[in-house]
Amino acid sequence: MNRIVLASMAALACASAFAAPVTYTLDPAHTYPSFAADHFGGLSVWRGKFNSTSGKVVYDKDAKSGSLDVTIDINSINFGMPKLDEHAKSAEIFDAAKYPTATFSGKFTKFNGSAPAEAQGTLTMHGVTKPVTLKIDSFKCIQSPLTKKEVCGVEVSSTINRADFGVNYGDKYGFNQEVKLQIQAEGSPAG
């Protein structure tokens, strides 16, 4: 009888361990938040990225739930052109001295099987918070052949209107205010 009780308790403990959400820490060396923005109303597209990002994802594949919190260092903006980088950080555009970070906080809202397919949340940038939906274009977890630990990777896309956040530089010159976001990230279980 005691063996049956012990076996049942062990089975319950194992089942709850498998069902528990896992917290993943984003790997800054494998996280690439990039964007594409209009220059002079269709003259060209300017592409850039942010070099410094941190965050975490809580993911429960069995419950099909999860959340994410990401912080981007605005001072790490990189167009590949130092003068443009400095202009983007200035009070005329991002005002990085006053608003040094952008943050996204959201929850997974759609799944494709057990993989998240969409996250809805809020983006805070330039002191303004607005709802944003992120489309999760791909999501995969594997055991890394290098570290022998689990790692998950994701490709995310969205489009925002930067004027909604008070970052409307160039509107008087006809700059389209829509910005396409393309984000690649990898993370591993925390701890």
Region roles according to the model:
Residues 1-18:
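Gram-negative bacterial Sec-dependent N-terminal signal peptides
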Residues 19-191:
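Low-complexity, acidic/polar, glycine-enriched regions of mature
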